[in-house]
Amino acid sequence: MGRYSKEPRNPTKSCKARGSNLRVHFKNTRETAKTISKMPLRRAIKFLKNVKDQLECVPFRRYNGGVGRCAQAKQWGTTQGRWPRKSADFLLQLLKNAESNADYRGLDTDRLVIEHIQVNRAPRLRRRTYRAHGRINPYMSSPCHIEVILSERERVVAKPREDEPHKKKISKKKLARAKEKMLRE
């Protein structure tokens, strides 16, 4: 079993999945993974399917040189965005793998949240392209490693109510007006 860069906070309520040397662009995958980080699992799967159908875009924040603008990026507070279909496919496969791992461990799949997702660069693959005058240039690819940790969301426990209600704070101005009103009557 490979090492993960981070251990889950509660290992009994978490599950992991990872992929190594995946033939998908690192930069696109990093931006897509950053977008779905901390999302509930159901929302992340829906988002990635929407990206494939170009209904929602992935905002490009770091690797955004030459990236065009789109109106769908406004909901993320930026102007540049794309629809990286292959990255969405790979992340969907990984999330489905992690979900089946969670199901195997007996976790509630409806309460899963993406606690940690990380994309690292893998060794570049070298090919060649033939140029004019007998020259050869490199034709490199940028694969990546992806790891994801899903955790069950903790249930929020409501505080017990106290018997006496909290006193409403009144500003000095309003207090002075109220006293003035009482003196007039």
Swiss-Prot record:
**PANTHER family per record:** 60S RIBOSOMAL PROTEIN L17
Which GO terms of the cellular component aspect does the record hold?
cytosolic large ribosomal subunit
Q: What is this protein called?
A: Large ribosomal subunit protein uL22
What superkingdom heads the lineage?
Eukaryota
Return one GO MF term: structural constituent of ribosome
Q: Where is the composition biased (Basic residues)?
A: 167-176
Say which species the protein is native to.
Answer: Diaphorina citri (Asian citrus psyllid)
Do you know which SUPFAM superfamilies this protein is assigned to?
A: Ribosomal protein L22
Q: Which family does it belong to?
A: Belongs to the universal ribosomal protein uL22 family.
**Which portions of the sequence form the region Disordered?**
158-185
Q: Which InterPro entries match?
A: Ribosomal_uL22, Ribosomal_uL22_CS, Ribosomal_uL22_euk/arc, Ribosomal_uL22_sf
* GO BP: any one term: cytoplasmic translation
Q: Name one Pfam family in it.
A: Ribosomal_L22
Which keywords has UniProt assigned to this entry? Ribonucleoprotein, Ribosomal protein
